[in-house]
Amino acid sequence: MWIADQWQDYELLDCGGGEKLERWDKQYLVRPDPQAIWETPRRLPEWKRANARYLRSQTGGGHWEKKALPESWQVRYKDLTFQVKPMNFKHTGLFPEQAVNWDFVMEKIRKADRPIRVLNLFAYTGGATVACAKAGAAVCHVDAAKGMVAWAKDNARLSGLSDAPIRWIVDDCAKFVEREIRRGKTYDAIIMDPPSYGRGPGGEVWKLEESLYPFVKLCAGVLSDKPLFVLINSYTTGLAPSVLGYLLHLLVAEKYGGTVSWDELGLPVTATGMALPCGATGRWFSE
């Protein structure tokens, strides 16, 4: 398991009973987590003193029950700064377990010692975009949600990257990649964080288990002659990490050589010393 254990502004204090207790800088949140199936005693007083708790409704969805919580605030990870804002469906705009991937891409870009062009797909609020740009890459950030792209721009600004070479694209990811192929554009690195389920602009159904292979195959068509890495994230519990590795072997490594690795992502749990699983990542890298 790749564990994001370098945080200072974020801490997973405890988890159990389908919930997790987190510290985001000075704010304490309780959020649902389907992986935390165990029942453990809630000894930490922050369980009761949390600034906000997300409560699921029996009809689907849910709502935040807030005591004293700012509308938004900032957290830092090393030299990166992000805006955190609790929103619908329990999310905060940041997945802290992704810090292990930010470290990975920053190291690869810095060691490459050449200009690197990165394509970040389903790029959300831009954690990976900011990491790549901070390491010196030119980034194309693509997400279908206009609000998420605006949030990502804000994260870039907070991290001192207002003038960095980042293209901000609001578009369907598959449609954008198809157009880039027609235009003859290539990238040295690709990052993708596709949803488990979604609908395209024409009502096309996206189901990760059925859509991921053809999508990765499509994306391989925009890789340069000397690619640096390809990274796939998945939060779909039905897909083992090794599935991501298998895809990368078939669609990237067989053409370019290099190395494929895969694993679960996790966050260390302060109360128990264990780690909470938070999805999976597959990585292909050349050097």
Residue ranges and their predicted role:
Residues 210-226:
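A short glycine-rich, Lys/Arg-flanked "PGG" loop and its adjoining helix->strand segment in the class I
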Residues 227-287:
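C-terminal catalytic and target-recognition region of SAM-dependent MTase-like enzymes
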Residues 96-114:
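Conserved alpha-helix/loop element of class I SAM-dependent methyltransferases that forms part
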Residues 145-191:
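S-adenosyl-L-methionine
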Residues 125-139:
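Conserved SAM-binding loop of SAM-dependent methyltransferases across substrates and taxa
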Residues 6-22, 29-96, 103:
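Non-catalytic substrate-recognition/targeting regions of SAM-dependent transferases
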Residues 123, 143-147, 211:
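Short beta->alpha hinge that forms the Motif I/post-I loop of the SAM-binding pocket
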Residues 113-124:
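Conserved class I S-adenosyl-L-methionine
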